[in-house]
């Protein structure tokens, strides 16, 4: 896929969805952070069902800590790996209180120091909660999950054997300081979740099918 084709692909995704956002429900950076922590190996729908009950009761580090381990588990027990996620959530809440006055930091190193937070989660928070294109070290970033990894490689937009390689090649291939760069994460996730799915991609209804390098297209 060449530069012009990539721009055409992003243009179509933009025209279909001019203002994309995460499907996780949140109203504060803290709510987003916890939702993303809970979303590993879980669906956004499943996470939302849990947080829609949790957040009216506890949506701050102090309030979640007050629930205790068993109390928190009672809200998130429908989510996969809920035991580990509950422990990480409580540890994260304590660190936010001890180190950041209960606020979510907008610095990569501080985010990635939180239990259960890796590069992807930090990138989602920096982009979606704080509206950033670059981190505090001045480096551009894109949050890459399994959907984006699959879509970028399958379409030919950006190749990479690992999510880190794919992220760097997406950054290289995407015009910066534009709505394309800021919104690509959400466009690719949504397109990968609903159209360019893993097993049987819906090529027949794909708005970028004619631009895509995938050779095993389905009807």
Model-derived features: positions:
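Catalytic cores of DNA base-excision repair glycosylases
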Residues: 2-219
């Amino acid at each position: 896929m060449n530069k012009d084709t990539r721009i055409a692909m992003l243009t179509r995704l933009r025209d279909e969805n001019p203002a994309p956002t995460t499907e996780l429900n949140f109203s504060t950076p803290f709510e987003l952070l916890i939702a993303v922590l809970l979303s590993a190996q879980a669906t956004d729908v499943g996470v939302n069902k849990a947080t829609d009950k949790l957040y009216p009761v506890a949506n701050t580090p102090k309030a979640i800590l007050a629930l205790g381990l068993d109390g928190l588990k009672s809200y998130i027990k429908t989510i996969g790996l809920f035991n580990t996620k509950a422990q990480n959530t409580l540890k994260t809440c304590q660190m936010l209180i001890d180190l950041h006055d209960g606020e979510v930091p907008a610095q990569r190193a501080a985010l990635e120091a939180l239990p259960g937070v890796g590069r992807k989660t930090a990138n989602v928070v920096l982009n979606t909660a704080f509206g950033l294109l670059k981190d505090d070290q001045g480096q551009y970033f894109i949050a890459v999950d399994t959907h984006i990894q699959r879509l970028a490689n399958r379409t030919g937009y950006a190749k990479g054997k690992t999510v880190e390689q794919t992220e760097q090649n997406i950054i290289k291939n995407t015009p910066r300081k534009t709505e394309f760069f800021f919104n690509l994460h959400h466009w690719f996730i949504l397109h990968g979740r609903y159209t360019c799915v893993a097993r049987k991609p819906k090529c027949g209804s794909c708005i970028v099918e004619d631009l895509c390098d995938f050779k095993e297209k389905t009807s």
